[in-house]
Amino acid sequence: MLGATSMRVHDVTLTLRPGMPTWPGEDGPRVEPLKRMARGDSSNVSVVTFGDHTGTHVDPPVHFLEGGATIDQLPLEPLVGRCRVLGYGDDDHISGHWLDGAGIGMGTERVLFKTRNSERWRDPRAPFDQEFIALDETAAHWLVRAGVKLVGVDYLSVEPFGSGKLGHPVHVALLRAGVVIVEGLDLHDVAPGDYELFCGPLKIAGGTGSPARVLLRQR
């Protein structure tokens, strides 16, 4: 029997690096030297530049709701606690009908979706894939009705590419209900099941989002 100190911890965070996939129209991260001991400085210091929706990141309400809470105003409770990782093998987007039979138990507050998207993260320089699997609007409303407080997905958006033409209905439905959205998870090495989630976005004043370190501890 595993003791608490020997439980495996999975890091499901994408590594921030130049050249990584980003949302179309958004710049990738840059890491530039500010000080280097090799050139006579007393320490090594870098300047890191990235958008606040780069890599594994958290969407606060203000991302799509004018006047909504910013990243530094998010409640902490949804970011830490028990979560369910659901495996999804279909090629269609995740629907409320599928969730009816997914076995999400009463009281489940955090749900992460592992789809074929996670396999793309094995290649850190794979180009952006517009055909990623996401949630449709019926799934968003299902999760809200079920009382879920945090939803995580394994690509760079919780809703299908091109949904901006429709007003981003999945984001809006979740964020209006106070559901925290975590995007860009790398779940390729994580089996479906129950875990403890630890999600730490940066505390950026007025931030419209933030990269986050996300860990799962095996239960």
Specify the residue positions occupied by each region the protein language model found.
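Active-/binding-site microenvironments in catalytic and ligand-binding cores
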Residues: 1-219
